[in-house]
Regions:
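Carbohydrate-active catalytic/glycan-binding domains of CAZyme proteins
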Residues: 1-174
Length: 174
């Protein structure tokens, strides 16, 4: 409703580091933004991490960005294709975070894409926190040590890293 007003880019840190795939959610009466971005300017490699911050309104963060996930497992750090083709420098990826509440609402969940999207190893990881935990505390988040979706060559599944949750018309299924 009403007239759209372009408010501009949301500044995610004082150095104006690169940030993409932002999404917002409300949890326990507080609006949050999650996104992926760089820890610092790229020099000879790149690491995309997942950040979270609280929001003052839909276009302004009200807290510093907090790193809650960075690529650490081998399955999150694949950037070379099976044929040897690769990017010019290593790129380790946690990106495209999507928030989801567990069915009984006792867990806050963030699904994210991991590894290079240009590889068949692109997959989906999962972070979970207790629903009553401080979501800005990195220690609240537990990372699954294995991907929740990954390639399965026997069934011709390659690179299932894109994440989207769509409810059924009656809202009972996702």
């Amino acid at each position: 409703e009403g007239t759209f007003v372009m408010k501009g880019r949301i500044q995610t840190d004082k150095d104006n580091n690169w940030a993409i795939h932002a999404s917002t959610f409300e949890h326990d009466g507080q609006r949050y933004m999650i996104w992926c971005g760089w820890q610092k300017r790229r020099i000879d490699s790149e690491t995309q991490c997942i950040y979270i911050a609280t929001m003052k309104n839909p276009w302004t963060l009200s807290s510093d960005r907090i790193l809650i996930s960075k690529p650490e497992y081998e399955w999150e750090c694949q950037w070379v294709n099976p044929d040897g083709s690769k990017t010019a420098y290593p790129i380790h990826v946690n990106e495209a975070p999507q928030y989801f509440e567990s069915k009984n609402k006792d867990k806050a969940c963030i699904f994210y894409s991991a590894s290079g999207s240009w590889t068949p190893y692109y997959c989906v990881g999962l972070l979970t926190a207790d629903a009553k935990a401080n979501l800005l505390n990195p220690a609240s988040w537990k990372k699954s040590p294995v991907p929740v979706l990954q390639q399965d060559p026997e069934n011709n599944v390659y690179g299932p890293g894109g994440i989207s949750f769509t409810p059924s018309p009656d809202g009972k299924e996702w």
